[in-house]
Amino acid sequence: IAFSAVLHYNTKSSRISAEIPNQQKGSDMKSHFTPHKDITGTLSILLATLCWGFSGCSGQYLLHDLALPTPVVLCIRQISAGIILIALDLLFRKSTQRHASCRSSIRTSKKDLLILIFFAIFGICLTQYTFFMAIYYSDSGTATVLQYLSTILIFLVTCVRTKTLPTKTESAAVLAAVAGTFLISTGGRPGNLAISGYALLFGVICAISYSTYTLIPGRIVRTYGAKYVVGRGMLISGILLSLFVRPWTYEIPLSSEVILGFCGLILVGTAAGSTFYHFGASLLSPVKAGTLANFDPVSSVLLTALLLGTTFTATDLAGFFCIIGAVFLLQLCRGRLT
C-alpha cells in the first residue's frame, strides 16, 4: 500500500508540475500543503518512527535474547538494507523519470565516488557499528536517545560555520541535552555510572559519527538523491565490513526466531520505515517532517519497554525527556541557521 501510494503521488506530482507555467508555480506552492495531505503525511512519518523503533527492538532481540554476534548481525543488515534501498531508488526513479542522467555519473566522478566511500566507512559503518554496540551493552531505547545527541553536535558545528551565537532557547536546549546525558549515565548521582561505561562510550561515539553521517554527504545527496547515496553507502560498508568480520565463518541458526528478528530489523526498519518516511516527507514541509522524525527515540523507548520488558528508572525517563525535548527545540529553531 505504501509503495503504491508513493508511486501514485510522485507520478501525479510530476504530471501536475509539468503542466503549471513557471509564473504560476509560486502562488500554487502556497496551497500545496492541504489539510488532507498534512494529516496523511503526519501519520506516515509517525508510522516510520514506529518502524525504526521496532527495528531497534529487533536488533536488541537478536543481540540479547538470541545472543547473535554483533558484527555478523551488522554485516547482514547493512548488505540487505543496501540492496533494498537501491531497489527502492530504482523503482521510484523509474516511476518518476527524474535524475535519469545522474544514475551513472557518480561512477565517472572521482570526487563524488571518494565522498561516497568516505561516507560509507566513517558515516554509515561507524554509526551502525557503534549503535549496535550501544544496544549490546544497554538497550535499544538508551542507544537511540544517545544517538540523537548528534542533533546538538550538528547545531554547534553550524553555529561555528555561520559564526552565529545561539539564542537563549538554543542555549537552554544544549544545556538540557547535557543534563539528560548526565542523568542517563549517572542516574543523578555524580561519580556513579548507572549504565555500562561501554554503552556510554559507544553511544557518544555513535552521536559523533551520526553527525558525520548527516554532514558529509550533503552535496552528493542533493545531486543523486538520499536513497541512491544511502543505499550504495550501506552496501559498500556491508561488503567492506564483511571482509574483516567474515560472517560466513559463523554458524547462524536459521530458526523462526532468527528469521523474524532479521525481518523486523531489515524489512520493517529499512523498507517500510524508509517508504513511510519519504512518502510523508513529500506531503509536508521540511521543518515539520524533520520535527516529526524526532519521535524515533520516543517510539524506541516505548517499544523497548512494551515488547522486550526493559525497565527504565524515573531518572532514565527524565534524562530521555531532556534530550528529546532539546532535539525538538533545536528542530523548531533550525530555520534561523539554514
Regions found by a protein language model. Give the residues of each.
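Specific transmembrane alpha-helical segments of multi-pass solute transporters/efflux pumps
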Residues: 92-141, 147, 183, 266-284
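Hydrophobic/aromatic residues within transmembrane alpha-helices
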Residues: 62, 73, 134, 139, ...
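C-terminal transmembrane-helix exit sites in multi-pass transporters
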Residues: 84, 89, 150-175, 298-318
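Transmembrane alpha-helices of multi-pass small-molecule transport proteins
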Residues: 66-125, 153-157, 208-216, 230-249, ...
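Helix-helix packing/entry segments at the starts of transmembrane helices
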Residues: 49, 76, 124, 142-149, ...
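Glycine-/small-residue-enriched transmembrane alpha-helix faces in small-molecule transporters
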Residues: 2-4, 8-76, 192-219, 239, ...
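Juxtamembrane helix-entry segments on the extracytoplasmic side of multipass membrane proteins
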Residues: 37-42, 66-71, 75, 108-112, ...
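C-terminal-most transmembrane helix of multi-pass membrane proteins
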Residues: 30-31, 78, 185-186, 258-260, ...
